[in-house]
Every structure is written in C-alpha cells, then in structure tokens.
C-alpha cells in the first residue's frame, strides 16, 4: 500500500472476521471507534459486525496480509475486479451495491472525506 493511501472506507462484514498482519511499514485501522497503529509483525483484528477501515499513514510503503475468516470472500474481489474490467474503470454503483449485498458487505462511502481529512490521506487511483 502506497504512503498516505486510504485502503478502504468504513465497512462492515456481516459474515466474516478479518485479520490484518503487517509484513512491513505502518498501517492504521479504525475498528469501531478505536484507531489502532500497527507495525511489522503486528496484527489488527476486525471482528464481523464491527465497522472498520484501514490506511497507510506513514511515509513508506506498507504490506499487509489479509485473512478473511471463514474463506470464500475472495470471490467478492474476483467479481469486483471483473466488474471494473467490464466498465474500463470504476464499476457501476448499482452493480457494486448488488455485489456487496450478496456478500454481506455494508460499505459507507460517506466516511471517505472524513477519513481522508482526519488522517491526511488520498484515495488510490483506479
């Protein structure tokens, strides 16, 4: 993850727990109302049902390994990639919403401006 990048807006998984293992760099996450800072070999636990977001606050690149439990959520990312490829850019919002609903994912795009301003972040390019 590039420096100063918002990895994801606030979102909630209804079926999965998520664990982020920091390989290198620094990552911050908002889990519920708590902001957690993690460095190499640290873990951030994001339980299902708890709104969370993550970003790279530092001046250096960061690498995280995401574990989403139970398995199967990787299909969401495959389908999201296919939607983006079909549209040659950001996917159609209604199709994205349908995809998120199928996977029990509740995204809060309205959180983006606040997260970016509060943590001095920018969005990745699509």
Task: Please place each PLM-identified region on the residue numbering.
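A hydrophobic/aromatic-rich effector-binding and dimerization subdomain
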Residues: 67-70, 74-87
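Short acidic-glycine-tyrosine-enriched beta hairpin
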Residues: 19, 26-28, 33-51
